[in-house]
Amino acid sequence: MKRLLVTACAAALAVTAAASAQPLTVPTKKAGKLIVGFDVPAPSFWNGRATGTTIKNPSGFEYALSQAIAMKLGISKVQYLRAPFSGLFSPASKKYDFALEEVTITAQRAKVVSFSAPYFDANQGVLIRKGLAKPTSIAALKKLQLCAQSSTTGLAYIQHKIRPAKKPLVYSSSSTAAFDAVEAGKCDALILDVPIVAAQSKKKPGAYGGVAGQIVTHEQYGAVMDKGSKLKPSLDKAINALKANGTIKRLVKKWLLNPIPPILK
C-alpha cells in the first residue's frame, strides 16, 4: 500500500513538474505569431522602406524592442503590419497584437485603447528652421510660427501651455509634412517628441537649425492594443523584464538620445 502511494505521489509530482515547464500560451491574434503595428517615417525608431503594408530591411529602437519582446514571450514568428498613426485610436478591433509608434500614454487615449507598461520616457522637442536664432526659453516660443502633427501631445502643449501669438500650423497625415514645413521655412519650430526630432535632425543635419531644446512634460510611450486586450499582462511582464535587465536602456543609447538637448524653461 505504501509502495503504491509513493509511486502515485511520484507520478503526480512528475506531471506537475512537466506542466510547469511548458510555456504558457500567449493570447495573440494568431497562435504562435506576433503581429506588430508600425508606421513610417520614424527615424531611429523604425528605419527601413515601407512596401505595401509591411517594411523591408527594418531596424531602429522600436523594431529592436519588438524583437526583444517576442523573445521574452517565447514567440519566434513576428509579422509587421503598417498601421497609420491617425487610426491608432479608433475603437474598432485592430489587426495587430500591439503597435509601437512613439505613442504617449494619456487618460483620454486610454478610454478607447489599452496601453502596455511604459517603455520610454519622452519630453517634447523643439526642432527649428535653418537660420533661426535658437530660442532659449518657453516664453521665446510664443513669438514664433509653431507647427505640430495632429492628434499629438505636442499640439496639445502648444494650444494649452505655450499659447503662441500666431495660430499653429497643423499637419494631419504624418510627421513628414511637419518636417517639410520646417525645412521649407514655413514653420519656425516644430513641437514633437524629442527623440523623433533629434533623430530627424541627425538624419538631415543641413536641412534644419537643429534641436533648440526640450520641454519637460513627463510623458511616457506605451504599446497600443485593443481595449481590454488579454495580451496586456504578458506584454507588461515582458517590457518590465526588459527594463529591469538593462535591455531597453542599451537600445535607447544605441538608437536614440545622444547628445541630450538642453531643457527649456
List PLM regions with ranges:
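Ligand-binding clefts/hinges and TM-proximal coupling segments of bilobed small-molecule sensing domains
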Residues: Q22-P23, T153-V170, G209-G210, N240-K265
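Acidic, polar ligand-binding/catalytic clefts
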Residues: V78-A140
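Bilobed "Venus flytrap"/periplasmic-binding protein-like clamshell domains
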Residues: I35, P43, K56-K72, V103-T104, ...
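Extended ligand-binding regions for polar small-molecule ligands
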Residues: Y63-K72, L132, T152, G222-P259
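Short helix-initiation/N-cap motifs at beta->coil->alpha
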Residues: V78-S90, A133-K134, L169-A184, E219
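A ligand-binding cleft/hinge motif common to bilobed small-molecule-binding domains
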Residues: G87-S90, V103-K111, Q159-H160, E183-A184, ...
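Periplasmic-binding protein-like
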Residues: V40, F120-I128, V194, A198, ...
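Extracytoplasmic small-molecule ligand-binding "clamshell" domains
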Residues: P23-E101
